[in-house]
Structure formats: C-alpha cells, structure tokens
C-alpha cells in the first residue's frame, strides 16, 4: 500500500472518517424534521405575541390614550425576536461541534444551538449602537451573512450533512450553498446593503447597494464558492430592484428597465461561464441551456415543476413563508403596524426588503425549491422588521428642537405639557390656552403672531 498525502496512513483511521459522516447524515435526517417544526412554531407564536404590542407601541403625546407597553415587556420581546432571527445561523454553526457522536444526538444539537443563539443574542444586545432603531437589524444581518459566507468561503463543510444544509445521501448537492443557506445569505446580504446605504448620502445609496450586492452575487454564483448560478441570477434581480429604489420613490419604468438590463447581463455572464465548464461539472443553469440545445429542455422544465410542487406541499418552510407573508400584509403594513413608517423614514431598508422578497421567490422557483428559500429568508427578515417597526412606533411622538430659525438638530423633547389654570398669566387670552402675544401653549401660533423658536417643534420621528 502507498500512503497518499492528506489521507490517513492506517486503515482504522481511514474507515473512521466515512463512518463518522454516516452517523452525521443519519442524525441530520432525524433532527432536521423536528428542528424546522420547532422553528416554524416558535416564529408563528412570536408573530402572534407581537400583534398586541404593535397596537400599543405608539406612545400618545396627549393626556388621554391607552397605557403604553411596559419597557421590560418590550425589551423581552426584542430579545426573543433577535433570538428567532439567529436560530438558523446558530443551527448551521452548531455543526462545528460533533454533536452527532453522542447517544442522544438530538438533545446535544438542541443544547449547542441554544447556547449559540444565547451568545449571538447577547452579542447583538451589548453591541455598540443597539439603542438605535436599526441597530439590532444591522447586527443580526451582519452575523447571519458572516456565518453563511464564512462557511461558503471555507468549502461549505457545515452545510454538507448539516441540519440546515443538505444531505449527501439525497445526491442533489455536494458542495456550495444549500436552499436554507441561500435564503439566509440573500436576506442577510441585502439587509446589510440597505443598512449601510442608509448611513450614506442619498446619491451614494445605489452605489453601496450594488457594491455589497455584487460581492454577494459573486459568492453565490461562483463555481468555486456557492456554485448556484440560478441563485445568483435571482440575487442579481433583487440587488437591481433594491438599488433602483434605494433613494426613495417607486419602481418607475426607467428604473425597471435598468434593473432588467442588469439582471439580463448577469444571466448571460453566468450562462457563458457555466456552459464553458465540463458537462459533469455544470450547474443547473448550464444543464438547462445544454438541454435546450439538444431538444430535451421540456423534460428539465417538467422535472423542475414537479420538484417545486412536491416541495411546496411537503416542506415546513412553506408554512413559515406563508405565515411571514400574512404577518407582513395584515399587520406590519397596516397603518398601526409601523412598517410603512419605517419605510418612509428609512427608504434604503424598504429597498433591501423588497429586493429580498424578489430574490427569494425567484431563487426558489428557478431552483425547484418552491418557497423554501423565501421561508429561510423570512425567518431572518420578518423578526427584524417587526423589531424595527416596534422601535419606530415607540419614537412616533418624539420631538426635535430646531435651532433658531434653522433645521432640527435631533435633540429629543418630551410632549408639551398644558399648564394648569392657576399657572396661566393674567391678561388677554388667559384661561383659553394662549398667553400674551397670541402664542399657544401647545406650540401653535395664532394669526398675526410670531411663535417662540422653542415652540416650533418638529413632529418627525427620531433619527438614528
């Protein structure tokens, strides 16, 4: 026998490696079912618990109004939302520890995952900028992108036979980004792009989104990294939409044309690269184009349609995607939900979330995984959207004191207090809420009067 570099020199050690992989694969199949069931149940229960908080999150400036939610309750719910968003990245990172070698593999996986979730939540909670409205969102998106991106850059070892990865026994994929990893990476990278774009001047926001999104597209589509050309095309479409509306406004015809041109250019580029590879190494896009060339493209479309339908019916991530869509449409996007206010104040975040929705849905349909990619992305995006909406509503009655005749400088003021009758000065207007000179005590001015500079308070939301 001849020893080969990089391989075990003795036979028992060589046999231990595939045996350990078999144990991991068997444990992964058992644990994955209940993990996703618990994830879906926890996210749905958390969504139901958030609804009454959204209703009462807006603090009323006047003397009459519903009692606000106690700060401790809000802080606890925020921590639960952060933990829910970090559940999938923590489950991916749990494979660093060989939990499958124990007698109770499922229990060990649960313990390791919960410890990682707790550590990630604590890191987000005590990170600088946590008090800002978008602070937790940016931190969670950064952690999720870092975990999945680092795994892809190091060979995707955590996703192979991982609970939130893919199984070698199924034979669908042996390297690169899996379905769940793609959803988390798409959502995390676009949220990071939106968070960074919101911190730069308006004219530079599309540049930031394209720069961050372009790096993510390369990671997803490179045959040596993510090896998912259809996912890269979907992500390109999402980045194009996000960049087009990152400065505010709607997706006009001209913006849509530019976004479509960018997506078409990326599609052609990945198609050329994939077709130049050997037939055995081509991705789904290259195989589909080759099938079109020899007249068997219809069979490929039929197989993809069947895979989409089967996944749509069987996968628990379908339930998670539908629950996330219902929460967004019937709660967060309502006038009391706070998401419209968030989008108005932070247009780059609206662009990032719109791009995430486009990319996740397209990636699932093109890749034959139906709503699985959207469900994985929603597990990260929706809890963070709910948290940001809660914070925006909580700041809805904040005031900013402007400089003398100048724009608001961001200092917060409490809501103006109406003085008691015995505090009102004598003279004209006494007792009716106005003082001498015609200036109202609530900051409004009567006709013909000049309000005091300190009373000209802006009603805009506090900025981060």
What are these regions (language model features)?
Residues 26-34, 165-185, 224, 289-319:
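Short aromatic-rich membrane-water interface segments that cap or initiate transmembrane helices
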Residues 135-152, 157, 257-294:
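Aromatic-rich transmembrane-lumenal/periplasmic boundary elements in polytopic membrane proteins
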Residues 1-30:
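Soluble extramembrane regions of membrane proteins in the secretory/endomembrane system
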Residues 253-261, 270, 282, 286-417, ...:
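Long, compositionally biased intrinsically disordered regions
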Residues 97-103, 220-229, 365-372:
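Membrane-interface helix caps and helix-loop-helix hairpins in membrane proteins
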Residues 19-165, 180-193:
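Core alpha-helical transmembrane segments of integral membrane proteins
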Residues 129-139, 202-207, 248-261:
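Membrane-interfacial entry segments at the cytosolic side of transmembrane helices
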Residues 42-50, 110-128, 176-196, 234-248, ...:
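Hydrophobic cores of alpha-helical transmembrane segments in multi-pass inner/ER membrane proteins
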């Amino acid at each position: 026998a001849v020893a080969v570099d990089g391989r075990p020199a003795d036979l028992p050690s060589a046999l231990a490696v595939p045996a350990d992989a078999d144990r991991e694969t068997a444990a992964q199949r058992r644990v994955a079912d209940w993990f996703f069931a618990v994830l879906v149940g926890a996210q749905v229960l958390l969504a139901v618990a958030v609804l009454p908080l959204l209703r009462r999150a807006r603090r009323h400036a006047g003397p009459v109004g519903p009692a606000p939610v106690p700060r401790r309750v809000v802080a606890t719910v925020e921590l639960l939302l952060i933990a829910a968003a970090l559940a999938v990245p923590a489950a991916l990172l749990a494979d660093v520890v060989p939990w499958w070698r124990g007698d109770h593999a499922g229990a060990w996986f649960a313990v390791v995952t919960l410890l990682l979730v707790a550590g990630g939540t604590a890191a987000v909670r005590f990170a600088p900028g946590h008090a800002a409205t978008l602070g937790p969102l940016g931190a969670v998106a950064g952690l999720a992108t870092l975990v999945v991106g680092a795994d892809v850059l190091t060979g995707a070892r955590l996703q192979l036979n991982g609970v939130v990865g893919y199984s070698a026994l199924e034979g669908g994929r042996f390297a690169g980004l899996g379905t769940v990893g793609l959803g988390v990476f798409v959502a995390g990278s676009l949220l990071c792009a939106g968070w960074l774009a919101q911190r730069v001047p308006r004219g530079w926001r599309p540049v930031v989104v394209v720069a961050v999104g372009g790096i993510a597209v390369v990671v997803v589509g490179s045959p040596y990294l993510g090896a998912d050309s259809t996912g890269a095309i979907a992500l390109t479409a999402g980045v194009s939409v996000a960049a087009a509306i990152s400065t505010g406004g709607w997706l006009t015809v001209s913006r849509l044309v530019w976004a479509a041109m960018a997506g078409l250019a990326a599609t052609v580029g990945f198609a050329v690269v994939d077709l130049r590879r050997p037939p055995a190494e081509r991705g789904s896009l290259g195989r589909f184009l080759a099938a079109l060339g020899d007249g068997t493209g219809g069979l490929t479309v039929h197989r993809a349609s069947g895979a989409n339908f089967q996944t749509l019916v069987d996968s628990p991530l379908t339930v998670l995607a539908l629950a996330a869509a219902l929460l967004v449409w019937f709660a967060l996007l309502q006038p009391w939900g706070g998401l419209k206010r968030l989008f108005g104040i932070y247009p780059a975040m609206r662009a990032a979330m719109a791009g995430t929705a486009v990319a996740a849905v397209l990636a699932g349909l093109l890749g034959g995984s139906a709503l699985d990619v959207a469900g994985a992305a929603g597990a990260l995006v929706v809890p963070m959207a709910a948290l940001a909406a809660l914070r925006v509503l909580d700041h809805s009655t904040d005031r900013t004191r402007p400089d003398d005749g100048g724009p608001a400088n961001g200092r917060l003021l409490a809501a103006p207090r109406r003085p008691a009758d015995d505090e009102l000065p004598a003279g004209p207007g006494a007792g009716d809420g106005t003082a001498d000179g015609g200036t109202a005590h609530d900051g409004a001015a009567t006709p013909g009067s000049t309000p005091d500079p300190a009373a000209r308070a802006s009603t805009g939301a506090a900025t981060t």
